[in-house]
Amino acid sequence: MIEPMASIALKAARAGAQHIARCYDRPDLIKISSADNEVFTNVNDEVRNIIIGSLRDKYPEHVFPYGDPEKKKNDYEWLISPLDGTKNFARQIPHFSISIACTFKGKLVH
């Protein structure tokens, strides 16, 4: 049986994946920018917001880097890469993923 926090993270990832799939099928919705040899898209931010919103609904006291305007103090911190493989996504190469992890007092727990 999957643990509750992992189950909630999986649901958040699925919600983000739906948005990625929608945008992947509609390249006209993707805005691409680059800096320092890195590629960024609007989809990265949109998916991050979807995932953080889903997780924050269940865990409002947890810390979400890039999602918290002011750094809160909590033992739980979520690490989110909303679109791992952005270059592939931007080039319409279907090799990309969502990565979500949770740490407790600096140690990976999920």
Language-model segments: residues:
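N-terminal subdomain of lithium-sensitive/metallo-dependent phosphomonoesterases centered on the IMPase/IPPase/PAP
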Residues: M1-L83
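DPxDG-like acidic metal-binding loop motif
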Residues: N74-H110
